[in-house]
């Protein structure tokens, strides 16, 4: 059977997108097949797979799978890419609302290759000894470093992800360097089990964490934080109302790479 697909990338975070608007040839049970599609030597190659599906109450539903073939938590760059995909298919307008695993999301297509994604509010941020831990749709461990170029993201990230605290469920691990108002980030992603060129929920987590510095508590104001990942530049906009982070937007590129068919 031939399965049509389209490949998208958001700042180098790449995804296989399957239009399941009318039929569902692939399902959540196809774990091994989905993992094989993500394999960069024996498949198409990607950080994850997404199904675009109809939904009765939203413009569409996003179903996301990690590169290991298992259904994953929210993927920020994936969310931006699937919005671009649906827009290019003519299924949605520039302003849209869709459903993901962590709940509803708003999004807007600013231009054909730039999408802004509304993220869930964040109320709980753990401040540990040299790290922050928070959930921006996916769990993220964030630690600040003086020189990101000296960090072995894979080795150090894997040690934290498989450490005693996170061994059972795992976590994404982010190493963040501040450079004035901007951030540079390296992320080890759970489910991919490797460093990725960008991680949208990790970039969001890093931007929120940056508002704690240097005073130790965010100010009641609007923020716009530029973040540079290995795969490109993004921006996170948000506000702090004294109790939680609100009006969070992950803004960045979402670009079609190619379309094709693969036999399964």
Predicted features and spans:
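Active-site glycine-rich loop that binds ribose-phosphate moieties when present
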Residues: 117-131, 155-160
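A glycine-rich beta-to-alpha transition motif near the start of alpha/beta enzyme domains, typified by
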Residues: 1-111, 142-264
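Short glycine/Trp-rich loop-beta-loop segment that forms part of the substrate-binding cleft
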Residues: 134
């Amino acid at each position: 059977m031939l399965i049509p697909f389209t490949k998208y990338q958001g700042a180098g975070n790449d995804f296989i997108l399957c239009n399941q608007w009318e039929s569902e040839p692939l399902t959540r049970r196809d774990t091994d097949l989905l993992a094989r599609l993500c394999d960069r030597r024996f498949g198409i190659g990607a950080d994850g797979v997404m199904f675009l599906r109809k939904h009765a109450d939203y413009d569409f539903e996003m179903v996301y799978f990690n590169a290991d073939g298992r259904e994953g938590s929210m993927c920020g760059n994936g969310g931006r890419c699937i919005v671009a995909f649906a827009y290019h298919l003519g299924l949605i307008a520039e302003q849209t609302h869709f459903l993901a695993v962590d709940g509803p999301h708003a999004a807007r297509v600013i231009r054909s290759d730039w999408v802004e994604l509304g993220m869930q509010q964040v109320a709980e941020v753990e401040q540990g000894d040299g790290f922050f831990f928070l959930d921006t749709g996916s769990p993220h461990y964030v630690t600040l470093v003086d020189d990101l170029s000296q960090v072995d993201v894979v080795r150090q990230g894997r040690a934290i992800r498989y450490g005693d605290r996170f061994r059972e469920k795992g976590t994404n691990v982010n190493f963040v360097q501040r450079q004035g108002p901007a951030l540079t980030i390296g992320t080890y992603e759970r489910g991919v089990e490797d460093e990725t060129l960008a991680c949208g929920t990790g970039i969001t987590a890093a931007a929120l964490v940056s508002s704690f510095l240097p005073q130790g508590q965010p100010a009641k104001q609007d923020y716009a934080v530029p973040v540079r990942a290995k795969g490109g530049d993004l921006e996170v906009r948000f506000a702090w109302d004294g109790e939680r982070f609100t009006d969070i937007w992950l803004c960045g590129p979402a670009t079609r790479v190619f379309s094709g068919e693969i036999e399964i």
